[in-house]
């Protein structure tokens, strides 16, 4: 339902092992709104999307992982800690490279492989002009964690 649709709008999804997700809207006289059918289709494929949307039965977190709806399943007691760990890792990333990675993946999913490769190559080249690339390389050589500035 709405919770799944909200999660489908996220770049990464971590589920507790006790979670269940579904699209029960048909039973309410509705259709999945807010991108529910379209995002689910792109993540899980046509057959799984039709099953979830037409039958309305929720699936377990483990099944959602198999379908590609979630990225990870962790014990419920560890959900917050795992989520904070992932968020901390992302926050420590080079902001320009993080944004470019998201752009490359998103654009690549909407175009042909040749166009996607050209865009990726262009973005890769742009990263060489950043202070963050120099800091990341320096930190790697010095065996320390980088301090990125977003420049």
Predicted regions and their residues:
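A short structural micro-motif
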Residues: 107-108, 143-147
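Short beta-strand->loop
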Residues: 112-117
């Amino acid at each position: 339902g709405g919770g799944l649709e909200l999660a489908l709008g996220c770049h990464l999804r971590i589920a507790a092992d006790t979670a269940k997700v579904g699209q029960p809207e048909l039973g309410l006289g509705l259709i999945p709104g807010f991108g529910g059918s379209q995002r689910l289709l792109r993540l899980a494929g046509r057959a799984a999307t039709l099953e979830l949307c037409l039958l309305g039965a929720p699936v377990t977190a483990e099944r959602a992982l198999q379908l590609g709806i979630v990225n990870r399943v962790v014990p419920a007691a560890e959900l917050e800690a795992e989520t904070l760990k992932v968020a901390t890792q992302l926050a420590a990333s080079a902001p320009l490279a993080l944004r470019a990675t998201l752009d490359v993946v998103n654009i690549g999913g909407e175009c042909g492989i040749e166009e996607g490769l050209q865009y990726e190559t262009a973005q890769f080249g742009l990263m060489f002009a950043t202070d963050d690339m120099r800091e990341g390389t320096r930190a790697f050589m010095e065996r320390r964690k980088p301090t990125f500035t977003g420049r």
